[in-house]
Amino acid sequence: MEVRHNWTVAEVQTLMDKPFMDLIFEAQLVHRKYQQANHVQVSTLLSIKTGACPEDCKYCPQSAHYRTDVDRERLMEVESVLDAAKKAKNSGSTRFCMGAAWKNPKERDMPYLLDMIKGVKEMGLETCMTLGMITADQAGELSEAGLDYYNHNLDTSPEFYGNIITTRTYQDRLDTLSHVRDAGMKICSGGIIGMGESASDRAGLFVELANLPQHPESVPVNMLVKVKGTPLEDAEDVDPFDFIRLIAVARIMMPESAVRLSAGRESMNEQMQALCFMAGANSVFYGCKLLTTPNPDEDTDMQLFKKLGVNSEQVAQKPDQIQEHELLDRVAERVAARPNKDDLFYEASV
């Protein structure tokens, strides 16, 4: 299969409607052709500036437009961010992502952001930031400081977008991605499933991503985390099989990209996550929180990787060079000793 940039919505919908087993099989074949089998890349995400965002994204608990339990916090001190990065590296992450709840970064904040990037890079970690919209000049500054990835999601299809966000346009998002690419950085861009969009909208999101001049190097696929106080707190649950199908579709359409299981993974049981990996997911966020929403902790992830025979880069980069099977056995023993460990997941397949 060739790498394409000319997908149509109708074509993607036909792909989505394939028999489940056929679709997963096709995705796994593509995955093994373009990606390393049985391998998952792990990243850590830190909120470096939380809450009071002026945007009105209906899914987001950090928006100043909604009453949620998220407290407003100033931009973190550089040293505090670097301390968190050290902990992430020691826990096994190979990429450190920093997110700020802004419409766009102010010029007064740029020196601090650049110092964060440089400090994290010195630790040998890949760096990623998500700061909202950025100008071409800001993209150049971030790139010069050593930023590897910039995250800016498209969220949904152009047609459904206005139902979710009104404070920035779809073109604003595409312009930011262009600035990132022109500055020589890698793109991390995906969307959110479960906001009330149609199957056609889901297909449209992936068409937008796959038809970019160059595919995003990383494609996070989020399942909506419903937060009390946001307009989407009562949204319908996403059918697990529909979500797994979308992972497969992303893998087939963007074979060279990393497909990341992102928000919503806390509500997926082990079987659902395993099927997502089979469908082509090969990256996860690692740690107990994604910005302000829950995420499976590191030990739980390592136990699942052991069950599946999945390798993560984090094992090979442990400072003491512990053999992978020894590390996984120790983690599994710790997790097995916990009470009510099965309560970490609800039965998402029902």
Swiss-Prot record:
<keyword id="KW-0004">4Fe-4S</keyword>
<dbReference type="InterPro" id="IPR007197">
    <property type="entry name" value="rSAM"/>
</dbReference>
<keyword id="KW-0093">Biotin biosynthesis</keyword>
<comment type="similarity">
    <text>Belongs to the radical SAM superfamily. Biotin synthase family.</text>
</comment>
<keyword id="KW-0808">Transferase</keyword>
<dbReference type="GO" id="GO:0009102">
    <property type="term" value="P:biotin biosynthetic process"/>
</dbReference>
<protein>
    <recommendedName>
        <fullName>Biotin synthase</fullName>
        <ecNumber>2.8.1.6</ecNumber>
    </recommendedName>
</protein>
<dbReference type="GO" id="GO:0051537">
    <property type="term" value="F:2 iron, 2 sulfur cluster binding"/>
</dbReference>
<feature type="domain" description="Radical SAM core">
    <location>
        <begin position="38"/>
        <end position="256"/>
    </location>
</feature>
<keyword id="KW-0479">Metal-binding</keyword>
<feature type="binding site">
    <location>
        <position position="57"/>
    </location>
    <ligand>
        <name>[4Fe-4S] cluster</name>
    </ligand>
</feature>
<dbReference type="GO" id="GO:0005506">
    <property type="term" value="F:iron ion binding"/>
</dbReference>
<keyword id="KW-0949">S-adenosyl-L-methionine</keyword>
<dbReference type="GO" id="GO:0004076">
    <property type="term" value="F:biotin synthase activity"/>
</dbReference>
<dbReference type="GO" id="GO:0051539">
    <property type="term" value="F:4 iron, 4 sulfur cluster binding"/>
</dbReference>
<dbReference type="InterPro" id="IPR024177">
    <property type="entry name" value="Biotin_synthase"/>
</dbReference>
<feature type="binding site">
    <location>
        <position position="260"/>
    </location>
    <ligand>
        <name>[2Fe-2S] cluster</name>
    </ligand>
</feature>
<dbReference type="InterPro" id="IPR013785">
    <property type="entry name" value="Aldolase_TIM"/>
</dbReference>
<feature type="binding site">
    <location>
        <position position="128"/>
    </location>
    <ligand>
        <name>[2Fe-2S] cluster</name>
    </ligand>
</feature>
<dbReference type="InterPro" id="IPR002684">
    <property type="entry name" value="Biotin_synth/BioAB"/>
</dbReference>
<comment type="subunit">
    <text>Homodimer.</text>
</comment>
<feature type="binding site">
    <location>
        <position position="97"/>
    </location>
    <ligand>
        <name>[2Fe-2S] cluster</name>
    </ligand>
</feature>
<comment type="pathway">
    <text>Cofactor biosynthesis; biotin biosynthesis; biotin from 7,8-diaminononanoate: step 2/2.</text>
</comment>
<dbReference type="InterPro" id="IPR006638">
    <property type="entry name" value="Elp3/MiaA/NifB-like_rSAM"/>
</dbReference>
<keyword id="KW-0408">Iron</keyword>
<dbReference type="Pfam" id="PF06968">
    <property type="entry name" value="BATS"/>
</dbReference>
<dbReference type="Pfam" id="PF04055">
    <property type="entry name" value="Radical_SAM"/>
</dbReference>
<feature type="binding site">
    <location>
        <position position="188"/>
    </location>
    <ligand>
        <name>[2Fe-2S] cluster</name>
    </ligand>
</feature>
<dbReference type="InterPro" id="IPR010722">
    <property type="entry name" value="BATS_dom"/>
</dbReference>
<keyword id="KW-0001">2Fe-2S</keyword>
<feature type="binding site">
    <location>
        <position position="60"/>
    </location>
    <ligand>
        <name>[4Fe-4S] cluster</name>
    </ligand>
</feature>
<comment type="function">
    <text>Catalyzes the conversion of dethiobiotin (DTB) to biotin by the insertion of a sulfur atom into dethiobiotin via a radical-based mechanism.</text>
</comment>
<feature type="binding site">
    <location>
        <position position="53"/>
    </location>
    <ligand>
        <name>[4Fe-4S] cluster</name>
    </ligand>
</feature>
<keyword id="KW-0411">Iron-sulfur</keyword>
